[in-house]
Amino acid sequence: MPRSRINENFIDKTFSIVANILLRIIPTTSGEKRAFTYYRDGMSAQSEGNYAEALQNYYEAMRLEIDPYDRSYILYNIGLIHTSNGEHTKALEYYFRALERNPFLPQAFNNMAVICHYRGEQAIRQGDSEVAESWFNQAAEYWKQAIALTPGNYIEAQNWLKITGRFE
């Protein structure tokens, strides 16, 4: 049974109903409809913590989806799963790929910054301040990009940039 038919969550049900209506009334190819169905099912599985199932759906959506903008969100969600699983190198790769297709994803820049900041903190714990500084500088660059896209967001990042003297 497709995942879209087993959702119990009210928001997921509402999203599924609206998505199904839109799929019927907006002129799209059958491939686009199938890609969206896999994407929707991937989001549903991801929200429930079923990451393996979500990845299967996202990979299938990637195979079918041709629009770069839509692909960017699929790649971004794959990055989120790898982040949640602690697979930071893979996550960064997917965030980069998402940004190649859509450079206006502040959340991807933010997530990349968070990973770099985390790695900087790890380097400090290991006693390597030079490596830590490099990671922190990279985090700062990503946060600046996220903030440039959405100036009212990422207040904690803005504060960190100011406190550490990285805000220009």
From Swiss-Prot:
Q: What is its main location?
A: plastid
CC annotations in GO: chloroplast thylakoid membrane
Q: Which SMART domains match?
A: TPR
Q: Where are the TPR repeats?
A: 35-68, 72-105, 120-153
Record has Flavoprotein as a keyword: no
Superkingdom of origin: Eukaryota
Pfam families (alphabetical): TPR_1
Biological process annotations from GO = photosystem I assembly
Q: How would you describe this protein's topology in the membrane?
A: Peripheral membrane protein
Q: Tell me, in a sentence or two, what this protein's role is.
A: Essential for the assembly of the photosystem I (PSI) complex. May act as a chaperone-like factor to guide the assembly of the PSI subunits.
The UniProt entry's sequence similarity note says: Belongs to the Ycf3 family.
Give the protein's recorded name: Photosystem I assembly protein Ycf3
Recorded source organism is Glycine max (Soybean)
Recall the taxonomic lineage recorded for the source organism.
Eukaryota, Viridiplantae, Streptophyta, Embryophyta, Tracheophyta
